[in-house]
């Protein structure tokens, strides 16, 4: 079965356009009823009134919105900066668990949200179209790929159609980027510099991504940039740069390099690219792709947010450099909220890192039935006994597993839904909203806060 969503509509439209001569960019979809929304120049004193059972109000100028979009097929985060600048960090595109056997030894996926018939890229696209601010004009100012795994940037499979002129498979990042003009495309750089064990296995998914990036550069002027580790001027507000000086995005890590805490300097503990290539994929010292993940520190006033892709510490007892969280911990501080590294699974979110971060709110983007893990959530609770845990998915199998391991599921604030953090313009407080993910109405099912920032 092939997906019959928006992605297929793109193909038909592009075929018509190609007959007019020359390659043309596929147009962004206009949201019915939102062509010219009324924008108030006044920053409200409190968050727009969000009521349980009603659709979450749209972003307001001055606020920082962080949306965890739940497709059940990976990880995707949509950011709206205080001036309306938009950024999509990852667009998970693993195959739906309902139609894909992940193989012996691998845990099955969770149910697709809202259902398996809507491609993950379409779920993400619909979400962005609904919440995107007027100032963005239906485009993405930034699109970022944390690392080169299918549950973050997509996979190539006959399940998905191909772009008629670009030749790339329309899934995940490529599908969203074909529909919405992208200003800058940010990633860790070339797949083989440094290489991970995944690079030796297959470059098919990465090659598809590169093909999309080249098409986007030609068709819509997208600029692909390697994340500059240590920089705080690469991801900035582009619509009203002077709107506030209390907002900052610091690039903490990418490609195995980590900010040192001094200026914009970065360093790596990994073997050189030449050494890693010489090792080959089977060498015990070889690093997995997760270690190459992009990590960011996002700040608005006293509010701090940490996101680290699939950063982990697996294998550190033998090879210390495989613990990418250790050097990150040295340059971080306590945060109000964070995305759990690697979907809150095992061998990640170390006690050493959490002793520094001590988040008040944890968002776990789980998409397999072994996520989140009891021992990992317990580490969060030990670091901050008051932490609120929000998971995008929790299967019945995992509920039974957690219970058998003595973890109280009632300790979790949410076990399904899109999770939205909305930070007040002052950066002094924030709210958390859980949105119903069983359809695309974006109604609030739970509301929390305000939480004060320290």
Label each region the model flagged:
Residues 21-24:
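Bacterial signal peptide processing site
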Residues 32-33, 38-65, 71-73, 127-130, ...:
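Flexible, acidic/histidine-containing loops and adjacent segments that form or flank the divalent-metal
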Residues 82-87, 93-185, 327-345, 356-362:
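Active-site metal-binding motif and surrounding structural segment of the metallo-beta-lactamase
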